[in-house]
Curated annotation (Swiss-Prot):
UniProt KW Aminoacyl-tRNA synthetase keyword: yes
GO molecular function: aspartate-tRNA ligase activity; aspartate-tRNA(Asn) ligase activity; ATP binding; nucleic acid binding
Gene Ontology CC annotations of this record: cytoplasm
Highest taxon in the source lineage: Bacteria
Database matches in Gene3D superfamilies: Bira Bifunctional Protein, Domain 2 (3.30.930.10), GAD-like domain (3.30.1360.30), Nucleic acid-binding proteins (2.40.50.140)
Assembly and interaction partners: Homodimer.
UniProt protein name: Aspartate--tRNA(Asp/Asn) ligase
Binding-site positions, ATP: R217, D218, E219, Q226, E488, G540, L541, D542, R543
Species this protein is from: Bordetella petrii (strain ATCC BAA-461 / DSM 12804 / CCUG 43448)
Enzyme class: ligase
GO biological process terms on file: aspartyl-tRNA aminoacylation
Family statement: Belongs to the class-II aminoacyl-tRNA synthetase family. Type 1 subfamily.
Record keywords: Aminoacyl-tRNA synthetase, ATP-binding, Cytoplasm, Ligase, Nucleotide-binding, Protein biosynthesis
InterPro entries: Aa-tRNA-synt_II, aa-tRNA-synth_II, aa-tRNA-synth_II/BPL/LPL, Asp-tRNA-ligase_1, Asp-tRNA-ligase_1_N, Asp/Asn-tRNA-synth_IIb, AspRS_core, GAD-like_sf
Amino acid sequence: MRTCYTGEVCRDHLGQTVTLYGWVNRRRDHGGVIFIDLRDRAGLAQIVFDPDNAAFATAERLRNEFCIRVTGLVRPRPEGTANPELASGEVEVLCKEVEILNASITPPFQLDDDNLSETTRLTHRVLDLRRPQMQRNLMLRYRVSIEVRKFLDQLGFIDIETPMLTKSTPEGARDYLVPSRVNAGHFFALPQSPQLFKQMLMVSGFDRYYQITKCFRDEDLRADRQPEFTQIDCETSFLNEVEIRQIFEDMIRHVFKTVQNVELPAPFPQMTWTEAMQRYGSDKPDLRVSLEFTDVTDVMRDVDFKVFAAAATAPGSRVVALRVPGGAELSRSEIDAYTQFVGIYGAKGLAYIKVNDASKGREGLQSPIVKNLHDAALAELLKRSGAQSGDIIFFGADRAKIVNDAIGALRVKIGHSEFGKKAGLASSDWKPLWVVDFPMFEYDEEDGRYTAAHHPFTSPKDGHEDFLESDPSKAFAKAYDMVLNGWEIGGGSVRIHREEVQSKVFRALKIGAEEAREKFGFLLDALQYGAPPHGGIAFGLDRIVTMMTGAESIRDVIAFPKTQRAQCLLTQAPSEVDEKQLRELHIRLRNVEVK
């Protein structure tokens, strides 16, 4: 039986005979004495094979990634050979017995190779997961889950599982559909979230629910998205939005303190959605970056520069300035690169003014657009933005969405650039934030109707219920997102608990009574049986762990992730299925070229 994990061998074991299991990380032959670095999930230990011992012959056969059992005596390392990088670095194990549990073919890569392509890593994921960094990532993920459970258990939350095979309902992204063999022509959907089931649990009287569960969305993938992801899903009854936020702010603070010994600020700052968009162009602003928008829409209405004037007078458009302290030193090539960058977000260009000498007014400014801006506009621009000599001011002028997306992304890019770091434009602190009071609806110009900004079960703010029928664009929601360093790590809301209000929301979304009854009849019925006031939140476990570990991709904190093409390179899923299986499911493929 194993005495302890290999990486846990230390001075406390001196003079003891221990049995260890693990993999050969490295083998070294030093003039007749063989050294093995034995590895397991806890770390490394040095194993020494003396040529006078019978185990030496077996040691000569050992190669990297052989799985072995070792029994030996723990002794101090010779003076001058201690390794402070290892927990076991002061000791070594003099092997008495060794057993090869399984040999290994030559691995396709060295585990300490940091330049592997992601394709190679995901194809050989079993070996990739042996790497110490990946083991640390997944162990940290486990610890986060444990601390979440501890915290919620102490507050009386109950872990209740909800179905994985459920009804397809519109929640913004495409569902993964599962055909029913028994009910021909009918399909289950894999849940995008347990949203409706957790609301049913509140109606059922389970007033505090949580679940760490898989969710599924068939959407285009980015670095921070997976088709299947893990959600910390929570719901509670009889609490208002302030009380709900307090519980889960405390939970995140607890997790960071216990897992990483990080003290997050208390309380988290709070900002309305409107303010966040006005100041940062984003509903998940990265507060590590000190740069902010200055809105100059009103200033630019009567200038001769048509790009600014048109945006300043068009409904739904805006003109903003982004002052970058010390940015006048940016080169033309750097500015061109930023111009190309904002083009990704739909911006048609990137106007700028370098403030060489603020005291000289127009004469101290450098830009092709200065001649098209009158003195009053320039003076107000400098006053509002607080521009000083040596600064640069970038501009966004277009439809509000394009300006917010483009200049908001530029703000973050400059802040975290080498220039931004040298200029002190971004901190390395943890910067949490609550963003509250979101619009209930977004208008889809293509379809000519409103869609739910979060989901259609979010309660309107007090006094906004009448807007559901008179003017949905004015309705704001009791919705809230927890943002950390520019990532939305959790989102939630107070839910609608009255059937008549839920029906009004469906009508605002152009979901007719018949469609609402067909898709959500069970919800509408449940709300009529004394449904309590309730609300909740869901956190992205994958995102939280990605941030804690500093991983470059969310795929580095998931054991067996999918690629950006939603494929598992290890198992080659998704795969074809044979005709018999399709017939049993009453499915026929049409116009599909199998690759």
